[in-house]
Amino acid sequence: MPTFEFIAFDADDTLWHSERLYADAQKRFAQLLANYHDPEWINDRLYQTETRNIQHFGYGIKAFALSLIETAIELTERRISSQEIQEIVGWAKQMLNAEVELLPQVSQIIPRLASQYPLMVITKGDLLDQEMKIRKSGLENYFQHIEIVSQKTLETYGKLFKKYSITPSRFLMVGNSLPSDILPILKLGGSAVHIPYEITWLHETAEQPPIDQTGYHQLETIGQLPPLLERITQNKE
């Protein structure tokens, strides 16, 4: 019997690059408003707007674009032109149409694990955008279930455990976000593997659990996941 009933993966910045697109757009945004404020102030105000808007628009590129526009209007005191707003909309379209670039070793590791464990994706964000990226990734058929959610909370995971009759102690979540992918799972009694990404959005930061906490593991790359699973299996035998 496999050690885990399910291994679930976050998608953005766990299976493929995503935050790079946002970081690039944020740099262009700071350049667009350079005549009004310095980059640090612009980025700080944008973060405040994004945080405030999550309850209204959720996560994803469309929500990000709306926050860019709102911030631009505020910071320019309504002096931003319609042409400049159209430029921001253009960035969002470019982001939505961007190719999906898998992280190193993902294309080898996911098929390998799919032959040994039931796999699923649990990702948050805009439904249409996430569905499109999953299709573009070429990984869709390796996952038995794909769940696109608005938030990753204790309640969200609890409902998914109930939906799929999952025993928390036999569930493993793999992701790059401590508050979204790791901490809720540990609180529910599951196991979690944190694989930090090169860029971390401020909203996804949190204090790291003790390295010796039961069920918690940290890796540098997804390529280290199969050996970790082997060690976990051996320790439970």
Regions found by a protein language model. Name each.
Residues M1-F4, Q83, S107, P111, ...:
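Asp-based, Mg2+/Mn2+-dependent phosphohydrolase catalytic module
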Residues A34-E50, E77-I88, Y142-H145:
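Short, surface-exposed acidic
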Residues T49-Q94:
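A metal-dependent, Asp-based hydrolase signature
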Residues E87-S107:
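Long amphipathic N-terminal alpha/beta scaffold segment
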Residues Q116-Y117, G189:
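Glycine-centered short loops/turns at secondary-structure junctions
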Residues T123:
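Conserved phosphate-coupling serine/threonine residues in phosphotransfer and NTP-handling enzymes
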